[in-house]
UniProtKB/Swiss-Prot annotation:
Lineage: Bacteria, Pseudomonadati, Pseudomonadota, Alphaproteobacteria, Rickettsiales
Domain of life: Bacteria
Name of the protein this chain belongs to: Large ribosomal subunit protein uL2
Presence of the UniProt keyword RNA-binding in the record: yes
Gene giving rise to this polypeptide: rplB
Function field: One of the primary rRNA binding proteins. Required for association of the 30S and 50S subunits to form the 70S ribosome, for tRNA binding and peptide bond formation. It has been suggested to have peptidyltransferase activity; this is somewhat controversial. Makes several contacts with the 16S rRNA in the 70S ribosome.
Length: 273
């Protein structure tokens, strides 16, 4: 997919850079594979903000994606590649030989008419899903499971992938884009290839309103708040906050490590860079 620039006939078009979606399906999604999705405005079931700066945005239909690829040894043909407003990657509508339809994450270079399959004996081909024990070392993968049968969790956003770098003692070692090396059980499944839409990282929204369409509200600085709202708030005139940057709850921000999960740390061979 190429990037699209615009003639600056308005100020917001001057900086706007979008992904060219002319090759994607222009119709509506398959109704049987969609469901309604309600907005939370960043609030939890108590009505308290748990995700700041969320709210508004265009209405969406949720596309039900098959992350598990549990239809084993049944070949499917790619009917079309679609845009999905719920994720940065594109999705592919596939039709199995028995007539069933399904949405999967579309990898790069997957085209309409291609055949994909989930099988232990599948070819090492873009879009095919296999257990890690059946995949040769050095293969580029996406939608990798962390627990057997749970469905893919690693490398699902636009342009991402992981590399299979080793196998030992019932575990596969994968290298993530962050530089982290991680162990995953060999019976976990993964899909061949890297995720579509790698140009997503190069887009420029061009104006604040386009961010609002995506459901993001303005990000307010702590120093612009009152003392009741933030540790950096208050002061006479403009102030610098008066302390090292912290979150609204007083914990250090700006890169302090917060991960505390000893139970799964044993699966991290090398920490991210």
């Amino acid at each position: 997919m190429a990037l699209k620039n615009f003639n600056p006939i308005t100020p917001s078009l001057r900086e706007l850079v979008q992904v060219d979606k002319t090759s994607l399906w222009k119709g509506r999604p398959l109704k049987s594979l969609t469901k309604g999705i309600s907005k939370t405005g960043g609030r939890n079931n108590q009505g308290r903000i748990t995700s700041w700066h969320r709210g508004g945005g265009h209405k969406k239909l949720y596309r039900i994606i098959d992350f598990k690829r549990n239809k084993i040894d049944v070949s499917a043909i790619v009917e079309r590649i679609e845009y999905d407003p719920n994720r940065t990657a594109f999705i592919a509508l596939i039709k199995y030989e028995d007539g069933e339809y399904s949405y999967i994450l579309a990898p790069q270079k997957l085209s309409v008419g291609d055949r994909v399959i989930s099988s232990q004996d599948a070819d090492i081909k873009i879009g095919n899903c296999l257990p890690l024990k059946c995949i040769p070392i050095g293969t580029t993968l996406h939608n990798v499971e962390m627990k057997v049968g749970k469905g893919g969790q690693i490398a699902r956003s636009a342009g991402t992938s992981v590399d299979l770098v080793g196998k030992d003692s019932g575990y596969a070692q994968i290298k993530l884009r962050s530089g982290e090396f991680r162990l995953v059980p060999l019976d976990c499944k993964a899909t061949i290839g890297s995720i579509s839409n790698p140009d997503q990282k190069n887009i420029n929204l061009g104006k604040a309103g386009r961010n609002r369409w995506l459901g993001w509200r303005p990000h307010v600085r702590g120093v612009a708040m009152n003392p009741v709202d933030h540790p950096h708030g208050g002061g006479e005139g403009k102030t610098s906050g008066g302390r090292h940057p912290v979150t609204p709850w007083g914990f250090p921000t700006k890169g302090k490590k917060t991960r505390k999960n000893k139970r799964t740390s044993k699966f991290i061979v090398k920490k991210r860079k």
